[in-house]
Amino acid sequence: MGKRILFFLLTNVLVMTTIVIVWSIISRFTNFGGSFETGGPGLGIDYASLMVFSLLVGFTGAFISLAMSRWMAKKMMNVKVLDPNGPLTERERFVVEKVHRLSRAAGLMHMPEVGIYQSAEVNAFATGPSKKRSLVAVSSGLLDAMDDDAVEGVIAHEVAHISNGDMVTMTLLQGVVNTFVVFLSRVAAIIVSRFVRSELQWIVQFAAIIVFQILFSILGSIVVSAFSRYREYHADRGGADLAGRDKMAHALRSLKAYLDRTKLNDGTDDSAVQTMKISGRGGVMKLFSTHPDLDDRIARLEQR
């Protein structure tokens, strides 16, 4: 899921920044859009209009990001989509059959696209704007490093994300976060622009909006990451229901064993495994991790 969240957050930041830049340019050179400054008492900001604007931009950006998620993932990772009716290798056929079988067990009416991408990293992700237009992709490194039961557990976990509707839920949360990001960045930019000469206020405010929006987006990702960690436990339970608790636990232990071997071989954490956030992080960086600590996930699964 780490890849899925990374794609979504990256796309969201790009979409939101583009919307704000276009809106700022249009409102600067036309009467459309206008200013949220009233010149009244206090900061002189029309908070009601700014909040409506922030809601529209925030949720528009989130849902555009959702709509682009599957396409973005396939392009960025160079995913080879597998045709279930076409010629496939034995390993490819295994992945397709497992995804379809587990999807049917999860009650999905439309089978997800299935893909493999060439990478040494041990990873898999599910993405897509809806249950009807979803994608489950696994890395070649995962297929090389894991046995069939572990691969099935990983696939079950990803199918559970689709069945649980995690992308849509994440989008709604991101829309709320975006709303506050837009609102607060505008207020902060207006305040900053008051400290420069009037002829420079527009360009300073424009630049400040971009800077504050990126800064607040990073802070907002803490909220999104916390929700992602919470949903990972649900996906583990869903994967256990679909493939069996033993296979789901075996998949998590296999991931941990791979990480431990990597540390033993070179004395450092494998960056590819860190992409999955399966090892957990300490200190402040733990706030930005999209996955809980792997030992904690195994312990919770075994307590079911």
Curated annotation (Swiss-Prot):
The residues that hold Zn(2+) are H157, H161, E232
| Any Pfam family the entry gives | Peptidase_M48
Could you give the cofactor binding note from the entry? Binds 1 zinc ion per subunit.
Q: Look up and give the membrane topology term.
A: Multi-pass membrane protein
**According to its UniProt record, which cofactors does this protein need?**
Zn(2+)
Look up the domain of life of the source. Answer: Bacteria
Give the UniProt keywords, A-Z.
Cell membrane, Hydrolase, Membrane, Metal-binding, Metalloprotease, Protease, Transmembrane, Transmembrane helix, Zinc
Compartment(s) of residence: Cell membrane
Q: Provide the gene name from the record.
A: htpX
- Similarity comment: Belongs to the peptidase M48B family.
Q: Which NCBIfam families match?
A: PRK05457.1 (NF003965)
A GO biological process this protein is involved in? proteolysis
Recorded E.C. number(s)?
A: 3.4.24.-
* Lineage, top ranks: Bacteria, Bacillati, Bacillota, Bacilli, Bacillales
Protein name as catalogued: Protease HtpX homolog
Choose one Gene Ontology CC annotation of this protein and give it.
Answer: plasma membrane
Positions of transmembrane segments: 5-25, 48-68, 172-192, 203-223
Q: Name one GO molecular function term.
A: zinc ion binding
Per the record, the major location class is membrane
The active site annotation covers E158
